């Protein structure tokens, strides 16, 4: 990836506009989960250390363009940053499109970009206004890199210099390492409820990976493709031919035993049984012990592991075991020298639940962007940085 990196630039005295991903959940005016802010703090500190005049912005939620409401404000993020021991004051500026007075030794947070008219459709006039605020534009929001918007693409077209921030650069390096030059054998684990939403991902990975593992509702479609009864399980009958095609093209292990329940609830009892014995009134909510052990063996022999999605309904304690065994096997493989990368909301929730955050090589912050990169799609915000880097 030939992009200019923020780490390589002299920023002393320069006005630096950082597009971060500070789209965090807010409850009662306070930040409810700070992971994305914590991930951005090193970028802010780096800009301050380099003597820059620092502006940072983000989207938050889904406001109506042109209509500011208090609940759309980045004020809770500003409050959080003021308590984050950055050593400088942090202030919010609401009206900034005609210019911002920013000094070295402070951080100015520019209000929610999605309130600005033309943001989502990448209005060039808005892109030019953002660009006029800065000497250097830093794209550091991998989670929105798959969207060409005024604050992710337009500004990068018109800013005097456009570069990748440390977070974005790390994402691109980690994904490149997993997908473009993987150590073999390479394993991809794809979970989720539907084959249809992950079909292009499965197709792309089947060409790169030595081994594919499918989990969740996706696995149910593969079980049905083998001719087994899946009862009331979530599966896609119309995609059975696709499942057969993928299974024939790639080595995909299908569960030999499963955990079933008769209702989708936290208190539903789990019954473990052979995959050949699922009754019409039962649903598959997890893999069984034999299948989990089989997957653990495959995982521990891999040298590169890409993980997107759980293998069962891990939110319910009775159907958690499969995902827990898989999670621990990935952690063990990583400890033994494998490179592991994980992405997607459910995957991150599983990582938190099983306490393996520090045992995965790289955890991606992007959901949609992560999947689009895996599919081999060009991410617009990265494409424009490459264009700018190469004149």
UniProtKB/Swiss-Prot annotation:
> Which is a Gene Ontology cellular component entry for this protein?
cytosol
Question: What is its pathway?
Answer: Carbohydrate degradation; glycolysis; pyruvate from D-glyceraldehyde 3-phosphate: step 2/5
| Pfam families associated with the record | PGK (PF00162)
Is Kinase among this UniProt entry's keywords?
yes
GO terms under biological process: gluconeogenesis; glycolytic process
Q: Which Gene3D superfamilies match?
A: Phosphoglycerate kinase, N-terminal domain
GO molecular function, one example? Answer: ATP binding
Reaction equation(s) it catalyzes: (2R)-3-phosphoglycerate + ATP = (2R)-3-phospho-glyceroyl phosphate + ADP
| The organism's place on the tree of life at top rank | Bacteria
Q: Which residues bind substrate?
A: 21-23, 36, 59-62, 114, 147
Cell compartments where the protein resides? Cytoplasm
Instruction: Tell me the keywords, alphabetical order.
Output: ATP-binding, Cytoplasm, Glycolysis, Kinase, Nucleotide-binding, Transferase
Principal EC category: transferase
Where do the annotations place ATP binding? 198, 315, 344-347
Report the EC number(s), separated by commas if there are several: 2.7.2.3
Asked whether the UniProt record includes S-adenosyl-L-methionine among its keywords, one would answer no
Q: Which family does it belong to?
A: Belongs to the phosphoglycerate kinase family.
Q: How does it assemble?
A: Monomer.
Q: What is the protein name stated in its UniProt record? A: Phosphoglycerate kinase
Native species of this protein? Actinobacillus succinogenes (strain ATCC 55618 / DSM 22257 / CCUG 43843 / 130Z)
């Amino acid at each position: 990836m030939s992009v200019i990196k923020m780490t390589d630039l002299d920023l002393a005295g320069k006005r630096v506009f950082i597009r971060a991903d500070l789209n965090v959940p807010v409850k009662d005016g306070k930040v409810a989960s700070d992971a994305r802010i914590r991930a951005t703090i090193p970028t802010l500190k780096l800009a301050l250390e380099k003597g820059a005049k620092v502006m940072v912005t983000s989207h938050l939620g889904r406001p109506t363009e042109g209509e500011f409401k208090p609940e759309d404000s980045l004020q809770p993020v500003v409050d959080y940053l003021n308590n984050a021991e950055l050593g400088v004051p942090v202030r919010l500026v609401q009206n900034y499109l005609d210019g911002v007075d920013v000094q070295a030794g402070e951080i100015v947070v520019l209000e929610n970009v999605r309130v600005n008219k033309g943001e989502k459709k990448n209005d060039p006039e808005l892109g030019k206004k953002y660009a006029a605020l800065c000497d250097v534009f830093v794209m550091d929001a991998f989670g929105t890199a798959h969207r060409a918007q005024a604050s992710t693409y337009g500004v990068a077209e018109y800013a005097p210099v456009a570069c990748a921030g440390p977070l974005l650069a790390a994402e691109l390096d980690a994904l490149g390492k997993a997908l473009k030059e993987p150590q073999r054998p390479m394993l991809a684990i794809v979970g989720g409820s539907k084959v249809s939403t992950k079909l292009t991902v499965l197709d792309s990975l089947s060409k790169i990976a030595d081994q594919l593992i499918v989990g969740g509702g996706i696995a149910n479609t593969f079980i049905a493709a083998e001719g087994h009864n899946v009862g009331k399980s979530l599966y896609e009958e119309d995609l059975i031919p696709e499942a057969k095609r993928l299974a024939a093209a790639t080595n995909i292990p299908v569960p030999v035993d499963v955990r079933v329940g008769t209702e989708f609830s936290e208190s539903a009892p789990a019954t473990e049984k052979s995959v050949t014995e699922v009754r019409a009134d039962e649903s598959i909510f997890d893999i069984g012990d034999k299948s989990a052990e089989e997957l653990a063996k495959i995982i521990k022999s891999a040298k590169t592991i890409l993980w997107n999605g759980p293998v069962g309904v891990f939110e319910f304690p009775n159907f958690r075991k499969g995902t827990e065994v898989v999670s621990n096997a990935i952690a063990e493989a990583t400890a033994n020298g494998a490179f592991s990368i994980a992405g997607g909301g459910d995957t991150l929730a599983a990582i938190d639940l099983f306490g393996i955050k520090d045992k995965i090589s790289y955890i991606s912050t992007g959901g949609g962007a992560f999947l689009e990169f895996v599919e081999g799609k060009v991410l617009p915000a990265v494409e424009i940085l490459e264009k700018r880097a190469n004149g």
